[in-house]
């Protein structure tokens, strides 16, 4: 197996309608030493039969329960051997040459542990040009909704790479434990990205590789529950202690503000469930924090450099006054952390 062989891992759940398009764009780009592993999370439609139709080289793993995206990815990684892992959503389509461009990053950027292509929406706008993380732990798809003309023409770094189309070196995956399987869904890519930066590794984007993602932002209560619960799990485990102390007043104020927004927008119960889950899981989170911080190779100031005070996602919005105060607070904290 060559050093740039890819293990493509696709996790499915009732994804029958998407697999034909994915397969048509993906399988012609696979090399002889690449692998294709499809992990089906207890689909009730024709996903498994569609997956088997992708060809003999497709290894299809069926699970009896839907344990979530990260758990499915971990199962697929365990069943593969290639040195580069490519975690790919089933509702994606690869542009011509995307795999070769992503593969080439392994040699051209040896300090990158993880990277992504430019992930595009079906209408040609950007879905994500690299993940962005607010200092409160809120993450989002960078430049979502912007025109493709604003994309860079050379590789660049980002806070985290999107789990919709995520390349990770197997060595780094194994050293840091890969995606957290207790997240079920949402934020596991952000968590991995911050852990990689904390460990002294780097994360980036190869914008010349393009993948189209049939993405729609879900505003359901269950998503808000998972986003908020997982935000706190990531924040408490990955942020250096000096940064947590510096942010404590802002985190408390933000919780009050988010509670008010949740009450206004109809997901207060989901937010309260997330707080309860965070409290109940605190002993486990603190135990995990000790393990994560044991891998740390950079200080609080260097880690903070990968966070931002700007909240420019079209799917998330903060009141102007709160954004202004947050920006001033963050600038002050960055100075104190130096």
Regions found by a protein language model. Name each.
Residues 18-20, 45-53:
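Acidic helix N-cap motif at the loop->helix transition within catalytic regions
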Residues 24-33:
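Short, acidic, metal-binding catalytic loop of nucleotide-sugar glycosyltransferases
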Residues 25, 40-49, 65:
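A conserved acidic beta->alpha catalytic loop
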Residues 62-80, 90:
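Glycine-rich, basic loop-to-helix element that forms the pyrophosphate-binding segment
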Residues 85:
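Short aromatic/hydrophobic "clamp" motif used to bind/position activated sugar donors
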Residues 93-133:
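Conserved donor NDP-sugar-binding/catalytic core segment of glycosyltransferases
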Residues 159-210:
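A short, conserved alpha-helix in the catalytic core of glycosyltransferases
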Residues 199-307, 326-327:
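Active-site-adjacent helix/loop segment of glycosyltransferases
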């Amino acid at each position: 197996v060559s050093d740039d062989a890819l293990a493509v891992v696709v996790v499915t759940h009732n994804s029958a309608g998407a697999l034909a398009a994915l397969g048509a764009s993906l399988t012609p780009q696979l090399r002889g030493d690449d692998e294709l592993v499809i992990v089906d999370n207890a689909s009730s439609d024709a996903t498994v039969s569609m997956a088997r139709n992708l060809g003999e080289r497709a290894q299809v793993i069926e699970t009896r329960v839907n344990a979530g995206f990260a758990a499915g990815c971990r199962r697929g990684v365990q069943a593969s051997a290639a040195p580069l892992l490519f975690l790919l959503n089933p509702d994606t389509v690869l542009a011509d040459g995307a795999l070769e461009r992503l593969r080439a990053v392994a040699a051209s950027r040896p300090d990158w542990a993880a990277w992504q292509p430019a992930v595009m929406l079906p209408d040609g706008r950007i879905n994500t040009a690299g993940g962005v993380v607010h200092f409160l732990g809120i993450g989002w798809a960078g430049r979502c909704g912007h025109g493709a003309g604003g994309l860079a023409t050379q590789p660049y770094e980002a806070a985290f790479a999107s789990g919709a189309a995520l390349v990770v070196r197997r060595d780094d995956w194994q050293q840091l434990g890969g995606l957290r399987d207790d997240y079920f869904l949402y934020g596991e890519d952000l968590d991995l990205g911050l852990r990689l930066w904390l460990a002294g590794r780097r994360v980036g984007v190869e914008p010349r590789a393009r993948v189209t993602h049939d993405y729609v932002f879900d505003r359901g209560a269950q998503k808000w529950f998972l986003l908020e619960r997982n935000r706190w799990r990531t924040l408490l485990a990955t942020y250096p202690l000096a940064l947590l102390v510096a942010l404590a007043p802002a985190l408390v104020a933000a919780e009050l503000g988010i509670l008010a927004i949740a009450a206004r927008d109809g997901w207060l119960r989901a937010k309260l469930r997330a707080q309860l889950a965070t409290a109940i899981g605190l002993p486990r989170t603190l135990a995990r924090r000790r393990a994560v911080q044991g891998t740390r190779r950079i200080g609080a100031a260097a880690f903070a450099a990968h966070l931002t005070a700007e909240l420019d996602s079209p799917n998330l919005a903060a009141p102007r006054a709160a954004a202004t105060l947050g920006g001033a607070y963050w600038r002050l904290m960055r100075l104190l952390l130096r």
